[in-house]
Amino acid sequence: MLSKQKIERINELAKRAKTTGLTEDELREQKKLREEYIQQFRQSFKNQLHSVTVVDGAGNDVTPDKLKQSKNKYRNDIH
């Protein structure tokens, strides 16, 4: 997860961008922080999806094949 300070900085830069504008350095910093945030968000979301198993009313595993393949690839990549 992104540190609290980085999230606060993202919000500070967004607020300033709407009011007074940002310098070139601040725009680069904002872009870098946003990319880092999105990357961590996506990884967290993937981790959540890899812990999901879909079952029907009868208790049968009906997890989509694409998700099963992604889980297997993820497990093989980390081991």
From Swiss-Prot:
UniProt entry keywords in alphabetical sequence: Cytoplasm
Subcellular location: Cytoplasm
Stretches of the chain forming a coiled coil according to its record: none
Major localization class: cytoplasm
Segments of this protein annotated with the region Disordered: 57-79
Pfam families reported in the protein's UniProt record: DUF896
Lineage top rank: taxon: Bacteria
Keyword Cytoplasm among UniProt keywords: yes
Compositionally biased intervals (Basic and acidic residues): 63-79
GO CC field: cytoplasm
Family to which this protein belongs: Belongs to the UPF0291 family.
Protein name, UniProt field: UPF0291 protein BH2353
Organism: Halalkalibacterium halodurans (strain ATCC BAA-125 / DSM 18197 / FERM 7344 / JCM 9153 / C-125)
